Design a protein with these regions (language model features):
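Internal, hydrophobic cores of structured domains that mediate oligomerization or house catalytic pockets
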Residues: 88-215
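C-terminal interaction module
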Residues: 2-88, 208-345
């Protein structure tokens, strides 16, 4: 049985403006409309994510397998996925047409490298489908999602450039189906993905970035260090860096070889809660405990296995990602930096 982790559901109001034109006395007049609605701004989920230093045409088979594995895992939950985006920011209701579009992105195509675009066309490479992406999600706040975004293909890719695949499950899914079900899903998704790094573990799915919601979430994230709030994407240029410490930590080349492989990890990790499992293709997964844990610092539950792995991986961890806040919000930057090092200090 999974541990009794806390529920986190933060409700709030979202405001945004849309623009259009209205004909008044024969003239088109620009109109600004304000939209206001309530939604869940933060909720607890299990997040699975992989950082893939490869172009789309090398990933198609693995991404299709990961998607099919996810769909099988959530079978029996009608409405879990009800909307989608595909190679465009606007979302649509998920119909057979939507599935056709997503499957089309996973059909092999002749790669076109970014260098092959004429200068006047290069800025439209994303719209041309050079970096295919799609997202599947359910009604707001239900915790189900699947997302894939390929990197732009270069003949010599910039080192930080990666494609990213991620999925989330509500924690209720973990409780209903059990830890083994979620563990097997993460392992099955990983099995055909040539990842550099990746993880599976507890996270807070945020509508707004953490620095805009710190007042709402401060108590939760400092009390429960097992909740991740860093939602890295392909825009962040993760390269081969490790994005924090989680329940299941997937490592591939070059980080794994620099740590001495699975044998080197076993020799340096001594927590009884830690297991190191070798995978095909010079990869491994480090699992911290039988189930994901949020921890509770008020009860002395500081997650020592997480802290031990953090010390080992510190040279390979992603640098603090919110340093730009130092000028406009130094207090927020300082607090988030303290959270970022919660397993190191």
């Amino acid at each position: 049985m999974p541990p009794n982790n806390p529920r986190v559901r933060i409700q709030g109001t979202v405001r945004y403006e849309s623009y259009g034109f209205e004909e008044i006395e024969g003239k088109l007049v620009k109109k600004v409309r304000e939209h206001v609605y309530d939604r869940i701004l933060a909720r607890d989920v299990v997040r699975i994510i992989f950082f893939l230093p490869h172009d789309h045409h090398h990933l198609i088979t693995g991404v299709a397998h990961a998607l099919d594995s996810y769909l099988r895992a959530i079978d029996g939950h009608p409405g879990a996925l009800s909307e989608y985006t595909c190679c465009w920011w606007e979302s649509f209701k998920l119909t057979e047409t939507g599935w056709d579009r997503i499957r089309e992105t996973l059909e092999p195509k002749k790669p076109r490298f970014f260098e092959d675009y004429e200068p006047h066309d290069a800025r439209f490479a994303e719209k041309d489908g050079a970096d295919p992406y799609f997202t599947l999600f359910g009604e707001q706040g239900n915790g189900y999602s699947f997302k894939y975004h390929a990197r732009l293909p270069w003949r010599e890719p910039p080192p930080p450039s990666v494609s990213v695949l991620s999925a989330t499950l509500p924690t209720e899914h973990l409780e209903e189906h059990g830890v083994q079900h979620v563990r097997e899903l993460a392992m099955t998704m990983a099995s055909r993905l040539p990842f550099a790094t990746g993880h599976a573990g507890l996270a807070l799915d945020l509508w707004h970035p953490i620095y805009d919601q710190l007042d709402r979430l401060r108590t939760e994230i400092f009390r429960h260090p097992g909740f991740d709030v860093r939602k890295a994407s392909h825009f962040d240029g993760m390269g081969t860096r490790v994005d924090g410490i989680h329940w299941m930590n997937f490592l591939g080349p070059p980080v794994l070889s620099e740590l001495g492989g699975a044998a080197g990890l076993r020799a340096r990790l001594h927590s009884p809660a830690t297991s190191v499992q070798e995978l095909e293709g010079e990869r491994t997964v480090i699992t911290l405990g039988d189930a994901p844990e949020a921890g509770d610092t008020t009860q002395g539950q500081t997650l020592p296995a997480y802290r031990e792995l953090a010390r080992l991986l510190e040279p390979h961890l992603e640098p603090f990602p919110w340093g730009y806040l130092a000028r406009k919000s130094p207090e927020v930057e300082e607090e988030l930096r303290r959270w970022w090092r919660r397993f190191l200090d």
